[in-house]
Amino acid sequence: MKAVPAAFLMALGLAIASHSAAAEDLMRGEALLTQACGSCHAVGRGDSPAKDAPAFRTLGQRYPVEALEEALGEGFMSGHPDMPEFKFDADDVGAIIAYLKSIQQH
């Protein structure tokens, strides 16, 4: 049996760790949105609990999801009176955007 080069094993380990971190970001993004927004918006595949609240999986049909990045980090305010203001730190914004990008239906 030939010895596996150390560089290959290191690259494989980094790839696995990177994939694991990306999966954790997606789960964290989903959890943050569920906690902050799930009482009105569909965060996953189902219908939104509030009939006028758009499902997050269709946001990309209205505008680029990345456009939300600044608003989420600086404080998201809507003209809708029932929607509270939300502000997330940079790591949470990254996780939220990653999750939103992963669920978009085009």
Enumerate the predicted regions with their spans.
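C-terminal capping alpha-helices of c-type cytochrome domains
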Residues: 85-106
